Design a protein with these regions (language model features):
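Short connector loops/turns at beta-strand edges and beta->alpha or beta->beta junctions
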Residues: 4-8, 51-52, 92, 155-156, ...
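Short, well-ordered beta-strand elements
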Residues: 1-3, 47, 150
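Acidic/histidine-rich catalytic neighborhood of metal-dependent amide-processing enzymes
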Residues: 12-112, 120, 124, 129-132, ...
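Active-site-adjacent substrate-binding region
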Residues: 85, 94-203
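Soluble metallo-hydrolase cores and metallopeptidase-like ectodomains found primarily
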Residues: 1-14, 188-191
């Protein structure tokens, strides 16, 4: 279970990044606490990525620094094949939560997550509107690891802009985030992990 904790470097205004960076970091801390309460059949890694954001402009080489490095290291160490699945969270704290179906994610894992969301009554938050996110799951997908990106907009969405009107602006502050959004995503992720434990060959 992974997310990034860095925020976009902005010199022209005070950028907090409460949702874009902050929400995933807070989520991972609580998920680590939750998962540590009981024993599990699977081994869980809670991974905090640095350098998800571009230093200048987003390109294949100026972005995803931490996840690219980690995927390369796991490959070199022969550890990558041990990973059954990767669940990435990013920008999950908006007060009006919307998680979109990411076409760059692994199909069977997408289906599992959205099925668990439906079971919990969260279908209005997990939308089957298809998008293609570029995020920290990409290096793992490219390396052959089943991965899913749970990501939503930051602030109100305008036509043609799925990132939200507060994305990378001074409006990305905690006042525009909601604890209930983190709770919803947390419950869905825990249900997904439970399903992976009980049915290791679910794909």
């Amino acid at each position: 279970v992974a997310g990034h904790y860095d925020t976009k470097l902005e010199n022209s205004f005070r950028f907090v990044g409460a949702n874009d960076g902050g929400s995933s970091a807070a989520f991972l801390l609580e998920m680590a606490r939750e998962l540590s309460q009981t024993r599990h059949k699977l081994t869980y890694w809670i991974v905090f990525f640095d350098g998800e954001e571009a230093l200048r402009n987003w390109t294949e080489t100026d972005s995803l620094y931490g996840s690219r490095h980690f995927a390369q290291k796991l490959t070199a160490d022969g550890e990558l094949s041990r990973i059954q699945a990767m669940i990435l969270v990013d920008m999950i704290g908006d007060a009006h939560l919307e998680i979109h179906w990411d076409q760059n994610s692994t199909e069977w894992l997408n289906k599992l997550v959205f099925t668990e969301a439906d079971k919990l009554g969260y279908s209005r938050y997990f939308l089957r509107q298809r998008v293609a996110w570029g995020d920290d799951h990409i290096p793992f997908v490219q390396a052959g690891v089943s991965s899913v990106d749970l990501m939503g907009p930051v602030g109100p969405v305008k036509p043609g802009d799925l990132f939200g009107s507060y994305w990378h602006t001074a409006q990305d502050v905690i006042q525009h985030c909601s604890p209930s959004s983190l709770t919803i995503v947390g419950r869905v992720v825990k249900a997904t992990l439970s399903e992976l434990e009980s049915s290791p060959h679910v794909q």
